[in-house]
Amino acid sequence: FMPKNLVIVESPAKAKTIEKFLGKDFKVLSSYGHIRDLKKKEFSIDVEKNFEPDYEIPEDKKALVKTLKAEAKDADTVWLASDEDREGEAIAWHLYEVLKLEPEHTKRIVFHEITKTAILKAIEQPRNIDINLVNAQQARRILDRIVGFELSPVLWKKVKPALSAGRVQSVAVRLIVEREREIHAFQSEASYKVTAVFLVPDTDGKLVEMKAELAHRLKTKAEAQKLLESCQSAIFTIEDITTRPVKKSPAAPFTTSTLQQEAARKLGFTVAQTMMVAQRLYESGRITYMRTDSVNLSELAINGSKEAIANMMGDKYVHPRHFSTKTKGAQEAHEAIRPTYMENAQIEGSAQEKKLYDLIWKRTIASQMADAELEKTTATISISNTSEAFSATGEVVKFDGFLRVYRESYDDDVEQEDETHLLPPLKKGQKLEYQNITATERFTQHPPRYTEASLVRKLEELGIGRPSTYAPTISTVQQREYVEKGDKTGEERSYNVITLKKDKITDATRTEITGAEKAKLLPTDTGTVVTDFLTQYFPSIMDYNFTASVEKQFDEIAEGDTKWTTIMKTFYKTFHPSVESTLAAKNAHKTGERILGDDPVSGKPVSVKIGRFGPVVQIGSAEDEEKPRFSPLKKGQSIETITLEEAMELFKLPRTLGEHEGKTVTVNAGRFGPYIYYSGTYTSLPKGVDPMEIELEEALELIKEKAEAEAKKHLKKFDEEPELEIMNGRYGPYIAYKGSNYKIPKDIVPEDLNLDACMEIIKLQSEKAASASAKPKRGKYTKKKA
């Protein structure tokens, strides 16, 4: 019996879920992502022939394609059920082309959730492949290939070898570089915040503390001093009390970018992690499609939420809402990210899946709940001998509404009001006793560095990238080492506190740690130099508006309003000549080079620049008779800010620590960090050990530890077969033989093996591998290309 229908999706997990909903007439197979792409090592685009792409089937997909071809041949109908965005449409088109499918036997189906209802409905309403969506994806892929392929050699020649440039990535790095420069240029300004604590009788006559604050900051210490002196003899009176109702409305359901931001703030997930977990939830039928910029909910979801809220919390919490999408070209998927079944408040799954699902469920439910109703009371307190006034605010929740389920988190650059409490009962004209009044020196903060989440928000705000590109962009800039995620240690600073208590004024200086930041995106020196170089020679590539306008053009292609080749021609006409002229230009200085001054000993110039393996300090120049001396920068140092003194410190290496068994022990710095050299062996210094401070004893201890670890790796050798060795690796014991590794079965003690037993294991595993490669291999699931 042959199933009449073949359904092809892009991932095995998705195939497994869909298979449950379709009868025995359907067979569901996976393409494991793209089955065809531009050639890896070649340009693969024929510019003369209207930018015709030259696609190839990667080696690891050939067996899979063969299987799919055979299965498609035997089926009456082939259903292409890849995801419903441009990327999915392109996968469907490549399958159609490569498998040589016939139009009358091929149907394209789309759905944005994997539920029985959605799948059966999709099968009732098939459509043709939308070539406009395919062209939009193809245009992005080809434009990105042109930029990457033509710009990278320019960087190899002008900055350093092995660099690569990407269209959206380069702009993302520019944002991070510019933010770092804003921070370095930032001048902090001081002002004084004045707060008072008053003692007020509560309903039972007991005195309670009530906090109040001066409505504005005072500019100088003298002004603060003067105000506190006035308060010494002042009478404090409640001049006015206002009470007004305040409503808070819930946030819209999640889009890709808001989910990435909230998961980072609430769960500490990286953007890539969020997408990986969300993909698993989508493919197992728990949530709708996770690449979307729409906040729309289906009627079904709104009704499902309504029932769930009424059952759990009662009718007064229900408030159905329709949200509309602001993003231009929100075409990727036509619904927000929400649970497939609103009645499921919890799911089975891994800890991460449960956490992310819980977040999505709460956000969706909250979006369909009533406003929170609060009452805000503000009391104005006059000071008898000055025109200044204090203000005390209190808030009371009359009805919690959606807050019962969900509160939105904020980034550290959004000012948050302190938690406010209920005010004690107050009357107009009431006189107040103060307990203390404090003027504290505060400072303006530099703009915060980006987190992954706030960078996504910025990219979306600027219209750069799309739901499918945020995560890959953020991963790529870190993989290429243009940006690193790191913590900034704070610095100590002192500040003034002037206090009035019991009519006495005291003046104190205190210290605090300021500016500490965790898991922020910091530009590397390479990232900074590449950004400056590209901004100078390729201003349009680095321009935010230009990058956003390219995204809009992709949207126009997807709508069928523009031909994709027209956009390619326009872009290439200006881009290609600037590549040619930049390559030909002669530069007097190396890109990013900074002269720090002269070496006090030799009088030669000292400069910093990007060397082959990263940032270096150089003494002397290539024209000198003597070869220049080089030293890599230490972690935390930057070519933008390093001083001559700090640079000279680096040349104190190599340091001789002493002798051991007649051989010298030295410490030095290399491209991978500081190391100890002794008797032909190199031992890396662990993090936190300073090469300028390490002593001989500690160095010998590290050498010994390394030797012991090495010895543990080598379990057994045989004289009669010197190429064979039993080793201990990170995944357990194995046999190393002629450049290949063979796993030792768990039930065998590796030290007990003799040579014959080893050869038997090798023979068995080689035969097994040979028979496995003869079968059609399951292709790897390659991640979607941005």
Task: Annotate each language-model stretch with its function.
Residues 260-262, 266-273:
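A conserved hydrophobic secondary-structure block that centers on an alpha-helix together
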Residues 238-242, 249-263, 288-292, 446-458, ...:
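Short acidic, hydrophobic short linear motifs in intrinsically disordered regions
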